[in-house]
Amino acid sequence: MPENLNLCHPYCKKNTVQKWGGIGAKDTLEYYNGLTLHREFIEWNEGQGYTLIIGKKDVATARVTWQINTLSEETSELSIRIELLPDVALRRYVPWLRGLIRRFYFIPKMQHYIHNVVKGFKYYAEHETPVTKNQFGYNAMFSVK
């Protein structure tokens, strides 16, 4: 569903679609902390998930895969996998420092982020009520208190 992050994402202030549906779809995410990221969908499996690249303007900083697994007629499972492109995302840091930042800051923050985004989709599916800002906890990389 286009712009579904407006309903389900606890750190997304605004999700705007430029082009929707299939490979080549594009949208923009504006987070509560002012960060704006652009997504371009590079794989699309209707009803099963998609893969996208995300970054600032034309610079991809990560590859993200969203996958939906149907467990039963009434139950599905959402998984999100983020593959950081560290030489791009952390390029302003010297190479030896990138590994430390990735391991001790980025990965824990992103695990928290993914966990809460999945919680947002679960909440919306169960309650049909939009998720609110920081509903499942604050994340400094994407929000403000």
Predicted regions and their residues:
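Short, conserved beta-turn/loop elements at beta-strand boundaries and strand-helix junctions
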Residues: N45-Y50, E73
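Short, highly charged C-terminal tails/helix-capping segments
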Residues: K14, H115-K145
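Short beta-strand segments that buttress and anchor functional surface loops
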Residues: A25-Y32, Y50-K57
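Solvent-exposed coil/turn segments that connect beta secondary-structure elements
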Residues: Y32-G34, E46, E83-L85
